[in-house]
Regions:
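Bacterial N-terminal signal peptides
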Residues: 10-20
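Surface-exposed extracytoplasmic segments
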Residues: 25-339
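Bacterial N-terminal signal peptides that target proteins for export
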Residues: 2-12
């Protein structure tokens, strides 16, 4: 099972190849709605889902990207998963597919730790040789929980650790010839070619699930400049995401956990924040509280940005697919109405 994500991750780092290689995958936009563009850590970029067979056993490989356009030149400190965001990958099976209801949801929750807070060196204290070693000052851990909406049960599948962000000399094994002086390694196609940090961060969870969470090259391809320049498209187009990273959560789900592989399944993802957050003078940290409120949603590529009118974009981000027919059907049927 471990090889399943070992194949997903290098493909996800090779722009465009994942879509061509997979049986069913979707990539989508990065700036869907006004409010979510102000919240990078909760801003969903892409959702991928495809079936793959490993050693006679089929799995549903899913992935959710967040934090668009991570500029490597800014340094490693800014780009991380948010402890205060609930990241979820939802899978619908059986009658739930047509109803737009999640049958099972998989939650990623993060916890950030510092080994030394009495230093200005936030991410790295020295060269990181292994994930979560003494040199990786800022380390993020995560828990994956399976929520079965049919029974209401919640089962923790396991935990993982996020590898360090790529920062040249501090993380040399991300780069060509394992040297921080060289550019980042190109996307790869085999397990053997994966970098050291990624290999160490792929975890096998309970019941045969496999997970990864960490920084990846952005595999989405779009000539965004020409699109927004009044559709003055270029041939060939230019990769606007080239050179930028994002943060990716990937989960391989055994198909027998979903009732077998002879069925149709629907996949979408959401991000949520706590309802309340109080800011006060003199506090080192604010603690959000209250129920989870959905702030981002991603499923069919480009639907929200490309078809939904401005007045409904934030509403789309904060609703479930179960109400799509009622609220957003008009955009699927009459595209001219929003141009």
């Amino acid at each position: 099972m471990r090889t399943t994500l070992r194949k997903l991750l290098p493909l996800a780092a090779a722009a465009g190849f994942l879509l061509a290689a997979s049986t069913s995958a979707s990539a989508s936009s990065h700036m869907d709605a006004p409010l979510i563009t102000l919240d990078d850590a909760a801003n969903t970029t892409d959702v991928y889902a495809f079936v793959q067979e490993e050693n006679g056993r089929k799995v549903l490989v899913t992935a959710l990207g967040v934090y668009p356009f991570e500029e490597p030149g800014i340094g490693p400190n800014k780009f991380n998963f948010d402890d205060d965001v609930l990241y979820e990958i939802h899978v619908a099976t059986g009658r739930d597919v047509a109803a737009g209801r999640a049958t099972v949801s998989y939650q990623f929750k993060f916890d950030t730790k510092f080994k030394n807070q009495k230093t200005i060196l936030q991410s790295y204290l020295n060269v990181v040789k292994d994930v979560d070693d003494a040199a990786q000052n800022l380390t993020q851990f995560y828990t994956v929980t399976k929520v079965d909406h049919r029974t209401g049960s919640q089962d923790v599948l396991g935990k993982g650790v996020v590898p360090p962000n790529n920062q040249g000399n501090a993380t040399p094994f991300y780069n060509k010839d394992d040297s921080g002086e060289n550019p980042a390694k190109d996307g790869v196609a085999t397990e053997a070619e994966l970098d050291r940090y990624t290999k160490q961060s792929i975890v096998t969870l309970d019941d045969g699930y496999v997970a990864f969470a960490g920084q990846r090259d952005d595999g989405f391809f779009a000539d965004i400049q020409s699109i927004f320049d009044l559709l003055k498209l270029r041939n060939p187009g230019k990769d606007s995401q080239g050179g930028f990273n994002l943060h990716l959560m990937a989960l391989a789900i055994p198909m027998d956990e979903l009732g077998g592989d002879q069925q149709t399944a629907g996949v979408y993802a959401t991000t949520s924040r706590r309802r309340f957050r109080i800011l006060a003078d003199g506090l080192k940290k604010t603690e959000p509280f209250g129920d989870w409120v959905q702030v981002g949603r991603q499923g069919n590529p480009l639907f929200n940005e490309g078809l939904v009118a401005i007045e409904d974009k934030d509403l789309y981000s904060r609703t479930q697919p179960s109400v799509d027919r009622e609220l957003f059907r008009k955009y699927a049927e009459d595209r001219k109405s929003v141009v």
